Amino acid sequence: MAEEHAHGSSTEIDYHRVKADPTARISPSCSLVGDVTLGKKVAVMAGSCLRGDDAPIVVEDECNIQEGVVIHEDYGKPVVIGRHKTVGHRAMLHGCVIGENCLIGMSCTIMNGAKIGKNSVVAAGALVTEGKEFPDGVLIVGVPAKVRRELTEEEIADMCTFPGDDYLKQTEAMLKDGVLFNPAPDFDFQA
């Protein structure tokens, strides 16, 4: 009989549930474990860890998860990352929801229950505390994180849209050079 966690989930977890679109681009040195879903053209770079033990992690189409990123859910708190997003080096996302077309800065931390609106930028090193919610189209900075100001359409294009497009092109080149790989239709990362 399975032991029960303090939050009521079983310790018998199926860690072979990763689902990746065949167009995803994956580094052989990343870690994908548990209930993780990668959309079309998602790139997961070296040293990143996505671990879905008790709730799902969903990374929607055309996201770039850069080197050293940690993404983990919590009991009843899935991680959902909207399409066309850049998650910067060494960022940590835990039990949060990120809107589409955002830039998540290097070494920032986004905690359980936090929500980031679409077309937003979370500055490098920011700490988004538990349960904090931010609207669409804002610059989020500091420890603890606060809205600095609204972003202009030009800033959204320069900081969110264009970098995401550039990373898609870079990961396509890495795929062609064998640095990244596409998963097979019967992909089982832990096999």
Residue ranges and their predicted role:
Residues 2-19, 53, 59-61, 67-68, ...:
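Glycine-rich hexapeptide-repeat left-handed beta-helix
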